[in-house]
């Protein structure tokens, strides 16, 4: 990874942890059993050293990224933030059991991604509203403009077209992520108005010192690249990266289908892109099947695949290391973009040992 990004990594890791630590210890994220649908296993953060219990506000989040934003904003306040999605699962396609709805009912606030992204969250919200439950609803997407599903692609290209709907993965653009941090801060202020100054300060610090730095480092990566096309063996989740940094992010399918719904024609189109641009490395989604990526390695000039993620979930080891949006950006997505764009050799990208760990990962 280039020196700018390496320096940014060190600064950001320190700053984020400083925000979370505050004047006293913040409880570390607690890992649960991968595949469990009991809720809360993606992590729990209790700010200002409070014990978990009913004497302080409890906030639950439907998606990892917004759990992470909420726990950072809530640092040094009595607010407890919980992630509902179990460790190891994708926050989009997961279907919880009835206990999750009860956790939302019991919580003081529910942070969600907006309508039509997580059907289970939409159903839970409908239940809350129908039953008159007073759980505060915090829409992380409020006021954020969405881009088209093929926004970074050529609509004249065969199979692309227009009017395919909107891409819901807005948080991959750090500037749009800043608006979601503000939305979450507004909701937490309404929940705990006595702590407004701390909540606003935490949000402002995170936006300025973390999200703006991530944005700048992404921009350095993409502006340094000689090629402006990235082939992903993954579903269509990265159009905001393409729009923000003027690069074609080519998924295997343009709609929101998961990568295990790939047709032979999708693989054929990917092969043509790989041949046309001389692509040697592709990105593969951490929480999706690796079969399409493995097929491209077998049948094309692609040498290997490396990880990308739309921050849709966390692995067990990420929870143990207390990784959030920032750490995933610097340790997963940025090194892979450096490699797939041809900026860096795999062995030179990321932290020490990154290529050995993630090359053709299982």
Segments the model singles out, each with a brief description of its role:
Residues 2-15, 20-21, 26, 33-362:
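Extracytoplasmic metal-acquisition and chelation regions
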């Amino acid at each position: 990874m280039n020196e700018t990004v390496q320096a940014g990594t060190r600064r950001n890791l320190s700053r984020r942890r400083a925000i979370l630590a505050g004047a006293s210890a913040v409880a570390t994220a607690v890992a649960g059993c991968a595949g469990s649908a009991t809720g809360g296993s993606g992590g729990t953060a209790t700010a200002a050293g409070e014990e978990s219990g009913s004497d302080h506000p409890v906030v639950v989040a439907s998606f990892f990224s917004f759990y992470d934003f909420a726990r950072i904003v809530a640092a040094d306040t009595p607010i407890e933030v919980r992630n509902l999605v179990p460790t190891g699962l994708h926050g989009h396609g997961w279907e919880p059991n009835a206990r999750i709805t009860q956790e939302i009912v019991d919580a003081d606030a529910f942070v969600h991604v907006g309508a039509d992204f997580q059907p289970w969250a939409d159903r839970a919200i409908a239940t809350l509203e129908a039953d008159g439950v007073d759980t505060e609803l915090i829409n992380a997407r409020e006021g954020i403009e969405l881009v088209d599903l093929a926004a970074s692609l050529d609509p004249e290209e065969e199979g692309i077209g227009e009017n395919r709907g909107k891409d819901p993965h807005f948080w991959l653009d750090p500037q749009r992520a800043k608006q979601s941090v503000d939305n979450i801060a507004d909701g937490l202020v309404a929940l705990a108005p006595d702590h407004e100054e701390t909540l606003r300060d935490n949000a402002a610090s995170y936006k300025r010192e973390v999200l703006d730095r991530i944005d700048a480092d992404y921009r350095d990566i993409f502006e340094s690249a000689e090629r402006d096309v990235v082939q992903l063996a993954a579903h269509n989740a990265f159009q905001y990266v393409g729009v923000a940094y003027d690069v074609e992010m080519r998924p295997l399918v343009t709609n929101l289908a998961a990568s295990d719904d790939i047709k032979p024609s999708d693989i054929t189109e990917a092969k043509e892109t790989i041949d046309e641009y001389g692509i040697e490395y592709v990105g593969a989604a951490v929480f999706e099947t690796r079969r399409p990526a493995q097929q491209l390695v077998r049948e094309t000039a692609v040498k290997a695949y490396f990880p990308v993620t739309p921050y849709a979930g966390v692995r067990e080891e990420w929870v143990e290391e207390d990784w959030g949006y920032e750490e995933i950006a610097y340790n997963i997505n940025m090194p892979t973009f450096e490699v797939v764009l041809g900026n860096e050799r795999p062995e030179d990208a990321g932290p020490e040992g990154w290529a050995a760990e993630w090359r053709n990962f299982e």
